[in-house]
A protein has these predicted regions:
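Conserved functional hotspots at enzyme active or ligand-binding sites that engage polyanionic ligands
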Residues: 1-122
Length: 122
């Protein structure tokens, strides 16, 4: 893991993640994802090649469910409007992170937190 990767491991960062191999309907391939784990856990993961919790992102925005969040390109740094899929929430090894892709605003992060609560019935 590079020093650059350690800097990227912040809650709200949009990073590019290599999700393969996957099973069934899991989000696959190299795609953006939002880091949602807390920064203390993220720092520990960076030191020990541990895991961070992410929400995968897709550019398929035809439907946005209550457990998903529309991510406008202008507000995130992504190349096109996308959506975060809280139903695909998962822990990934920091070794799967390929680089930076953008950031969520605090307002979008609040929406994503709510989408996670809806999905997990918290």
């Amino acid at each position: 893991m590079s020093d650059t990767t350690a800097v990227l491991l912040r809650r709200g960062a949009v990073v590019t993640v290599s999700f393969d191999p996957v099973t069934g309907s899991e989000a696959a391939k190299v795609r953006p994802a939002v880091i949602v784990s807390n920064n203390t856990a993220n720092a520990a993961a960076a030191r020990s090649c541990g895991v961070v919790t992410v929400v995968p992102v897709t550019s398929n925005t035809a439907r946005v469910h209550p457990f998903q969040v529309l991510l406008p390109a202008k507000a995130t740094g992504l190349p096109r409007d996308s959506k975060a899929q809280a139903e695909q929430l998962r822990a990934v090894s920091v070794s799967r992170i390929r680089g930076a892709a953008g950031w969520l605003t605090s307002e979008l992060m609040d929406e994503l937190d709510e989408a996670i609560r809806v999905h997990l019935a918290l």
